[in-house]
Amino acid sequence: MFRQSVFVIAIALALSGCAGRGEVLNNDPFERSNRFMFKVNVQLDNYVLKPVARGYLYVPSPVRRSVRNFFDNLAAPVTLANDILQLEGKRASTTALRFGINSTVGIFGLFDPAKRLGLEKHNEDFGQTMATWGMPEGPYLFTPIYGPSSPREFSGWIFDWMFDPMTHQDDWDLEKAIGRYAVDGIDFRADALTTLDEIERSSVDFYATVRSLYQQNRKSEIANGVTDIDDLPDLDALDDLDDF
């Protein structure tokens, strides 16, 4: 039930950034075990995360938006480190400015004045960085709790964890980490309720759809949104995720 640790959160991120349909190789030699874990995580979502997310929608929208802004701001140092490692000077400058402005004027990231100044948010992680360095992703994996991934992306998550400033606090422990990622994950899941339900209802094979969306999204993220793949069919609910 953590941000990007719960498979539905990873799907929500994939849907919000997915750029196209394209010819994407499945690269899924462990499909049988992956499908089993997918079913397990679907049940965890149905009986744990989804009910909590529905209740979270009763929290006023401005409060939920501030929660989202806060967690986005916490992720900025990780994005900045990867911007630098990818030699993306302009994007690194944008990330640094956003973090500085939102951490001060935005009151520890609760608000996003940087966006009103034209400094748009983007996300980077070490999985993307390794891809730009030419490291192969390895086979598709659907892991317990963490969700859609690959050996490259999973190892990248460990590196990103090291650059997360929260992990270096003296009083940081497992209980605080679980609380942080649980709230973050519930917030994302609440935003994606309608979208994911629509995707599941319209999919002949929900597992294959999730796999395809995830792989396409990672391809788009690695290319910083510049791809040569065709547009996906429009889904109105996807537009609602773009601001989160």
Located regions from the model:
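Post-signal peptide N-terminal segment of mature Sec-exported envelope proteins
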Residues: 25-50, 54, 72
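Terminal hydrophobic membrane-targeting helix
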Residues: 24-32, 57, 61-68, 85-89
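Short, residue-level hotspots on alpha-helical faces of the histone-fold
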Residues: 50, 69, 98-102, 106, ...
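Mid-length scaffold segments of soluble, non-membrane domains
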Residues: 73, 77-151
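A structured, mid-to-C-terminal "fold-capping" secondary-structure block
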Residues: 20-21, 31, 134-244
